[in-house]
């Protein structure tokens, strides 16, 4: 008799849970007001509302020795870090284009001179990252608003036209731009 009573109580609990656990259709949501109402069309009042996940990125961790060119092209988060440990001989140049006005905060375009060629980062290419040249990072290229031409000797010299990111320079063991 006690077993039947326990089985009956458990059956009632399951039925009550399924009936009482159903919502009535009027939940307590927010009113829909947020930072979407703040206009960010003018740059003197820059409002930001973000709840995105933490950015992920490129990570290389090794005790080996890497030789050769490394070119990275693409969109990166607005706030980013780079950590390089050890002895490293490096040279590079690039153009970063970012803006405010549509609510999107981030680096929208980052271009360097990568492709096939000779020298540090000089090469022949077109598309997102283009450049034609030899030497450090000098080159001639067009990369959708980020291009340049010039020559570099162990440095980052170049003459470019990149909608506000261009310059002329000659680099010998350094970086020349104006």
UniProtKB/Swiss-Prot annotation:
Region spans: Central domain:
47-110
Q: What is this protein called?
A: Chorion class high-cysteine HCB protein 13
Q: For the region Right arm (Gly-rich tandem repeats), what residue ranges are annotated? A: 111-178
Region Left arm: start-end pairs: 22-46
Q: Which domain of life is it from?
A: Eukaryota
Q: What does this protein do?
A: This protein is one of many from the eggshell of the silk moth.
Which keywords annotate this record?
A: Repeat, Signal
- Residue span of the signal peptide, if any? 1-21
Q: Which residues are connected by disulfide bridges in this protein?
A: none
* Repeat is among the record's keywords: yes
Family to which this protein belongs: Belongs to the chorion protein family.
Q: What species is this protein from? A: Bombyx mori (Silk moth)
